[in-house]
From Swiss-Prot:
It is found in: Cytoplasm. It catalyses: tRNA(Gly) + glycine + ATP = glycyl-tRNA(Gly) + AMP + diphosphate. InterPro entries: aa-tRNA-synth_II/BPL/LPL, Gly-tRNA-synth_heterodimer, Gly-tRNA_ligase_asu. CDD domains: GlyRS_alpha_core. This is Glycine--tRNA ligase alpha subunit. Tetramer of two alpha and two beta subunits. Signal peptide: none annotated. The keyword Transmembrane does not apply. Keywords: Aminoacyl-tRNA synthetase, ATP-binding, Cytoplasm, Ligase, Nucleotide-binding, Protein biosynthesis. Its EC number is 6.1.1.14.
Length: 289
């Protein structure tokens, strides 16, 4: 199955399960959880069901395209359903079957692995899903996002698209994956990966990144004062990416790391609180759906 067909098939499967099919969010982020369709919609009483593919950037994970299974830019497929439905594990297994993976013919294990994002003030309980010895999915019941308790509890299912594709296509390297019948993964992403790694590890200006972090932090605070939740979240995500770039350059001390994380977490919590206040002022309109 081609890489693009995996996404299309997951879209079809989860659409038929009642999920909105959304598009990626247009700001750098380290995980699909940072998309407002997850980070904001996971909190508050309103129901929500959404699925989307999300490109993610983790600068420190880059290896200039030399590692067969590791890259600073990759794709997740994110599913959020609130409240979590009954028999969600069975639905997940059905989604694998929809991709051509028969659970009866493979060793599929749910391995306990609770999840936490310190910068987002988010955590949950759940499992890694292992397929014939390879982790392919994270399965999490969110407990908090932005320091706000989740009630009702949503389920987050995060598929590692490259890992699933290497399994389906029997490839040893993500760079050899067939995107479609004419192009492989490296045709599209290898030059991008090399360029971005050069920037992440060598070419970025740490002093400018520090300045940008301060500017983005100041802008986020200003936007929160104006009760503009979505733009504020954009600048929190920019702060997070600046922090990750500084981390990739190796210029953050242990003390600095803790301080940067606390600054981002504080902003994320304020964004989450702002979201709840804003939705409450609208009388939580999705409760009427």
């Amino acid at each position: 199955m081609f890489f693009q067909d995996i996404i299309q098939n997951l879209n079809k499967f989860w659409s038929e399960e009642g999920c909105l099919i959304m598009q990626p969010y247009d700001t750098e982020k380290g995980a699909g959880t940072m998309n407002p369709h997850t980070f904001l919609r996971a909190i508050g009483p309103e129901p929500w069901s959404v699925a989307y593919a999300e490109p993610c950037r983790r600068p420190t994970d880059g290896r200039f395209g030399d590692n067969p299974n590791r890259a600073q830019h990759y794709f997740q497929y994110q599913v959020i359903i609130k409240p979590s439905p009954d028999r969600i594990q069975e639905k997940y297994l059905s989604s694998l079957e929809f991709l051509g993976i028969n659970p009866k013919e493979h060793d599929i294990r749910f391995v306990e692995d609770n999840w936490e994002s310190p910068t987002l003030g988010a955590w949950g309980v759940g499992w890694e899903v292992w397929l014939d010895g390879m982790e392919v999915t994270q399965f999490t019941y969110f407990q908090q996002c932005g320091g706000v308790d989740c009630n009702p509890i949503p389920i987050e299912i995060t598929y590692g698209l490259e890992r699933i594709a290497t399994f389906l296509q029997d490839k040893e390297s993500i760079w050899d994956l067939d995107w479609n019948k004419d192009f492989n993964y490296s045709d599209i992403w290898l030059q991008f990966e090399k360029n971005q790694c050069e920037f992440n590890f060598r070419a970025s200006n740490p002093e400018n990144m520090r300045k940008l972090f301060s500017i983005y932090q100041e802008e986020a605070v200003s936007l929160l004062d104006k009760k503009l939740t979505f733009p504020a979240l954009d600048f929190v995500l920019k702060c997070s990416h600046c922090f990750n770039l500084l981390d990739a350059r190796g210029v953050i001390s242990v003390t600095d790391r803790a301080q940067y994380i606390e600054k981002i977490r504080k902003l994320a919590r304020e964004v989450a609180s702002s979201w709840i206040i804003e939705r409450e002022s609208l009388k939580f309109p999705l409760l009427k759906k």
